């Protein structure tokens, strides 16, 4: 089973396309929707829904993945639920990048203070990071510097922030999921 979390643009037709692409490596792909506007509520909702999906699935190696803000949530929720994660162009600091876009971006900061201390060290090797060199939203060199001590990083030379085409990375995802 693969759980897919969308980014900030939850209505993008690209989300459906990514789900279809993921079905090439696992027929059981679950799209979990969340508001993107209420971080504390989103975290509670995602924890509940991901936990429920894991319980319903017979997959011994479930995986959670997401793009942008979905990458932020995939890393945290995947860690808390004990499943591997694949994150594309993750928004590592929504408390900064979401200012002016949502009412309470400071809730992300509150979430990070309540998260397990040094969770990345405890999550080491359980997350695959795929970064685009053409990301027009985030500086992925900084993202790589922040994550490289904990996770393997794969660079993509053609995709933009929304990562429309994940197909080039499906086999790496499949191998990571099975490992």
From Swiss-Prot:
Record GO cellular component, one term: cytosol
GO MF annotation, one: hydrolase activity, acting on ester bonds
InterPro entries linked: AB_hydrolase_fold, UPF0227, UPF0227/Esterase_YqiA
HAMAP family: UPF0227
Family affiliation: Belongs to the UPF0227 family.
Protein name, entry field: UPF0227 protein VC_1892
Organism name: Vibrio cholerae serotype O1 (strain ATCC 39315 / El Tor Inaba N16961)
């Amino acid at each position: 089973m693969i759980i897919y979390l969308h980014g900030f643009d939850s209505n993008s037709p690209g989300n459906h396309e990514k789900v279809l692409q993921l079905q090439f490596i696992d027929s059981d792909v679950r799209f979990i929707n969340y508001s993107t506007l209420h971080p504390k509520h989103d975290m509670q909702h995602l924890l509940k829904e991901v936990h429920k999906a894991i319980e319903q699935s017979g997959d011994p190696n479930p995986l959670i993945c997401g793009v942008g803000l979905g990458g932020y949530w995939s890393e945290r929720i995947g860690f808390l639920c004990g499943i591997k994660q694949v994150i594309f162009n993750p928004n590592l600091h929504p408390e900064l990048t979401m200012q002016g876009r949502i009412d309470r971006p400071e809730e992300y900061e509150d979430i990070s203070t309540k998260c397990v201390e040094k969770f990345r060290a405890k999550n080491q090797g359980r997350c695959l990071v795929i970064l685009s060199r053409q990301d027009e939203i985030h500086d992925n060199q900084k993202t790589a510097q922040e994550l490289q001590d904990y996770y393997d990083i794969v660079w993509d030379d053609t995709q933009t922030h929304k990562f429309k085409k994940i197909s080039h990375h499906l086999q790496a995802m499949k191998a990571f999921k099975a490992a």
